[in-house]
A protein has these predicted regions:
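Glycine-rich, flexible beta-strand/loop modules in the N-terminal catalytic cores of phosphate-handling
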Residues: 1-29
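Short pre-catalytic strand/loop immediately N-terminal to key active-site residues, enriched for Gly-Thr
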Residues: 39-52, 192
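Phosphate-handling active-site elements
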Residues: 31-40, 66-87, 207-218
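Short, contiguous, well-ordered secondary-structure segments
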Residues: 20-42, 181-183
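Conserved, helical-rich catalytic subdomain that frames metal- and/or nucleotide-binding sites
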Residues: 6, 20, 94-96, 100-191, ...
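Conserved glycine-rich beta-strand-loop-beta hairpin in the small C-terminal domain of fold type I
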Residues: 198-201
Length: 233
């Protein structure tokens, strides 16, 4: 084949645009003559589209990491940042699976051995368009993470922060408000927050047992919603 082939399978593989983060990555690599072969890429899509969890960005990041690890392409730090930024602002976060802060000046700081939290991730049947949610932003908040510190991963700090896009999404989609209210009263989570521009809502728990019990109860009461438990890195 004269073109790269990107195949998606899995529960959330339907209706993925042919112009996506992975095709964007390959277009960039070919334009810069960093690759000269054609590839068949198979991706199992386990993360829902339009959930605000950056699944597409992480797909591209992991393929780029693989190419670097296998010496298929040789890149310096500046080139990696350039490629990541071209694909999407959060792609750079996926280049190293650890706790990271991306500052407003596009600098990244990574931290090891942060406290692990257990998460219950819930998504209704509808998704949120990032472009649409951002179009309702009237005023941007002052940057809070220009001076990253490890304490920003402490529970007390995280509990006091907020997602500036949450108010917009919850106003547009009242169902999200109901989910958040339900989760806040489900087995005493540390805090509950919307992901990115939505539509997934995450409840954070101190123990796996609390999280598992909460998941069981949520699934019992909301059979039509996607719900999965996980943990922070």
């Amino acid at each position: 084949s004269r073109n790269n082939r990107i195949l998606f399978n899995g529960k959330f593989s339907k209706n993925i645009n042919s112009k996506n983060t992975v095709s964007k990555l390959f277009n960039f690599l070919e334009r810069k003559k960093l690759i000269n072969q054609k590839y068949l890429i198979k991706i199992t899509k386990n993360i829902p589209q339009k959930s605000g969890m950056g699944g597409g960005s992480m797909n591209a990041a992991n393929i780029l990491k693989y190419f670097i690890k296998k010496n298929i392409i040789k890149l310096n730090t500046k080139q990696i940042s350039e490629i990541a930024e071209y694909i999407g602002s959060d792609v750079i976060l996926g280049m190293d699976s650890t706790n990271s802060i991306l500052t407003s000046k596009k600098k990244i700081k990574r931290y090891r051995k942060c406290k692990r939290l257990f998460t219950l991730i819930v998504k209704p049947k509808f998704g949120c368009s990032t472009r649409e949610i951002y179009s309702h932003v009237k005023k941007f908040d002052k940057a809070k993470f220009y001076n990253p510190q490890k304490k920003m991963f402490d529970i007390d700090f995280l509990r006091k922060t907020n997602n500036s896009l949450e108010k917009i999404a919850l106003k547009k989609y009242p169902a999200l408000s109901k989910i958040k209210f339900y989760l806040k009263n489900l087995k005493e989570p540390i805090f509950v927050r919307m992901t990115g521009s939505g539509s997934a809502i995450i409840a954070y728990y101190a123990t796996k047992r609390q999280c598992d019990i909460a998941q069981k109860q949520f699934n019992k009461d909301h059979k039509k919603y996607w719900c999965i438990s996980s943990k922070t890195i």
